[in-house]
C-alpha cells in the first residue's frame, strides 16, 4: 500500500515539475523570437527567390497589388490584423492557385507556404505580436483587386511576395521596438 502511494506522489511531483518548465520554454521562445525573426525572414526570402522569376515573368500587369496603404495598416493600429489576414490570404487563396500553374514550381511554392505557416505559428505563440481580431480595409482592397484580376491575380500576388515580406519585416521591427 505504501509503495503505490509513494508511486502516486512521485508521478504527481513529476507532473508538477514538468508544468513550469513548459511555460518557461514557451516564454523563452517568445523572448528569443526577435532574435530569430531575421532568420525566418531570410528563409522566406530564400524560398521566394526560387519562384520569383517565374511569377514576375508571368506578371504582365503594370498596377501594384500591395499598395502603400497596406504598409500603413501594418504600421498602424490595425497592423496585427492586417498581417494576420495577409498571411491567411496568401496561404488560402494565392499559394494554392500558384502551385497549380507549373509542376516545376509546385514544390517551391509549397516550401514558401510552409515557411509562412511557421512564421504564423510563432507569431500566434507569442501573443504580443498577433493579438487581434479587427478587419483591415487595405487587406480587403488587396483581396478585391486580386479577385478582379482573376487568373492574372496569382501572378501579380506571387510576383509581389517580396513586398509582403518587407511589410512583415516593418511590422515586426515596429513591434519589437515597442
Curated annotation (Swiss-Prot):
Residues 1-18 form the signal peptide. Glycans are attached at residue 134. Coiled coil: none annotated. It comes from the Eukaryota. It holds the Pfam family IL10. InterPro entries: 4_helix_cytokine-like_core, IL-10, IL-10/19/20/24/26, IL-10_CS. Its main location: secreted. Disulfide bonds join 30-126, 80-132. It is found in: Secreted. GO terms for cellular component: extracellular space. PROSITE patterns: INTERLEUKIN_10. Keywords: Cytokine, Disulfide bond, Glycoprotein, Secreted, Signal. GO terms for biological process: branching involved in labyrinthine layer morphogenesis; cellular response to hepatocyte growth factor stimulus; cellular response to lipopolysaccharide; chronic inflammatory response to antigenic stimulus; defense response to bacterium; defense response to protozoan; immune response; interleukin-10-mediated signaling pathway. GO terms for molecular function: cytokine activity; protein dimerization activity. Homodimer. Interacts with IL10RA and IL10RB. Major immune regulatory cytokine that acts on many cells of the immune system where it has profound anti-inflammatory functions, limiting excessive tissue disruption caused by inflammation. Mechanistically, IL10 binds to its heterotetrameric receptor comprising IL10RA and IL10RB leading to JAK1 and STAT2-mediated phosphorylation of STAT3. In turn, STAT3 translocates to the nucleus where it drives expression of anti-inflammatory mediators. Belongs to the IL-10 family. This is Interleukin-10.
Amino acid at each position: 500500500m505504501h509503495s503505490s502511494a509513494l508511486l502516486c506522489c512521485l508521478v504527481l511531483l513529476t507532473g508538477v515539475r514538468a508544468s513550469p518548465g513548459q511555460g518557461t520554454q514557451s516564454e523563452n521562445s517568445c523572448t528569443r523570437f526577435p532574435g530569430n525573426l531575421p532568420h525566418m525572414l531570410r528563409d522566406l526570402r530564400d524560398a521566394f527567390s526560387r519562384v520569383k522569376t517565374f511569377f514576375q515573368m508571368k506578371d504582365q500587369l503594370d498596377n501594384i497589388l500591395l499598395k502603400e496603404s497596406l504598409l500603413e495598416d501594418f504600421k498602424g493600429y490595425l497592423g496585427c490584423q492586417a498581417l494576420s489576414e495577409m498571411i491567411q490570404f496568401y496561404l488560402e487563396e494565392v499559394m494554392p492557385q500558384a502551385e497549380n500553374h507549373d509542376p516545376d514550381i509546385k514544390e517551391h511554392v509549397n516550401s514558401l507556404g510552409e515557411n509562412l505557416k511557421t512564421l504564423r505559428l510563432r507569431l500566434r505563440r507569442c501573443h504580443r505580436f498577433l493579438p487581434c481580431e479587427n478587419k483591415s480595409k487595405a487587406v480587403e482592397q488587396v483581396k478585391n483587386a486580386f479577385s478582379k484580376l482573376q487568373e492574372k491575380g496569382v501572378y501579380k500576388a506571387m510576383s509581389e511576395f517580396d513586398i509582403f515580406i518587407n511589410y512583415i519585416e516593418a511590422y515586426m521591427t515596429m513591434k519589437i521596438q515597442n
